[in-house]
Amino acid sequence: MPVQCSNCEQKRAVLKRPKTGHSLCKDCFFWAFEEEIHQTITSAGLFNRGETVAIGASGGKDSTVLAHVMKLLNERYDYGLKLLLLSVDEGITGYRDDSLETVKRNQQQYELPLKIVSYEELYGWTMDAIVKQVGLKNNCTFCGVFRRQALDRGAMMLNVDKICTGHNADDVAETVLMNVLRGDIARLRRCTAISTSSEGDGAIPRCKPLKYAYEKEIVLYAYFKKLDYFSTECIYSPNAYRGHARAFLKDLESVRPSAIIDVIHSGETLSVKEGVKMPVQGTCSRCGYISSQALCKSCVLLEGLNRGLPKLGIGKHHRLHGKILAQEPLTEQEERKLKAVDF
């Protein structure tokens, strides 16, 4: 016998929500999913009327659902926001070029302005070229650092007030686990924040409207809404450290469905003992971007790439590391030694 929707008790249920276990029809699922995101936005006070908001758009399921729901809620509840799409072209042939075609279709479907910034334009490097230098082991480090800064730079070009990204509950829980495993207290402290910005640091505030939305439900929403999105995984990501945290989280979820939200809530309630020294935010002496060091991570990685020392900003530091970052000239002998070192 068909299962009835547990909400309206009139229509046939088409799914069982991974998040709550409720059996719902399509319409009730759509409403519940959208209303939960609306509650997240309003309870956290993510936006103010009149603001210009850039939606980080990759063409994937998360950013496509985010763009769709943000436009819908902005109209349904009269948020009074000006929405834009902002995409980053990392320069990954056979992946990002295809996904950007999806973003361009989304632009037409949602009638939102679109800005695309590229690694090549901003840094003089594409990810394809970087992978040739560093291999597949550490390429995600470069991409993550460059992408974050590229989004900020693109947002500054558009003169927006805020950036919203498609990070979902699974992403946040994975990040909590990764920071615990790495012992990264500074990142662990801020990774669960739904809105990130520091007074006076010059960075454009970012927020995560999908912070409590399960990845499985985002997929179901996109499927039943027949949204146009790009579903191929990045060709360079199989070796990413995040994959181990994801696999562990999936194992936990299979035993305890609330594990994702439980991990997020654990991260939110963690406190750092007094006396633990935390990094002090300043600005990069070279590019002016926010940094707790004299040079930001992006400039350190670029310095290594441009010097033919791609692993300079990764892992153990060589004794000449400080000299390089201080932009002091190296002797020919020092250059030869560095190029022979596996950092």
Curated annotation (Swiss-Prot):
EC number: 2.7.7.-
Compartment(s) where it occurs, according to its Swiss-Prot or TrEMBL record: Cytoplasm
Pathway: tRNA modification; 5-methoxycarbonylmethyl-2-thiouridine-tRNA biosynthesis
Major localization class: cytoplasm
Record's GO cellular component terms: cytosol; cytosolic tRNA wobble base thiouridylase complex
GO molecular function, one term: tRNA binding
InterPro entries in UniProt: CTU1-like_ATP-bd (IPR056369), CTU1_C (IPR032442), Ncs6/Tuc1/Ctu1 (IPR000541), Rossmann-like_a/b/a_fold (IPR014729), TilS/TtcA_N (IPR011063), tRNA_thiolation_TtcA_Ctu1 (IPR035107), UPF0021_CS (IPR020554)
Family per similarity comment: Belongs to the TtcA family. CTU1/NCS6/ATPBD3 subfamily.
Name of the molecule in the record: Cytoplasmic tRNA 2-thiolation protein 1
Gene that specifies this protein: ctu1
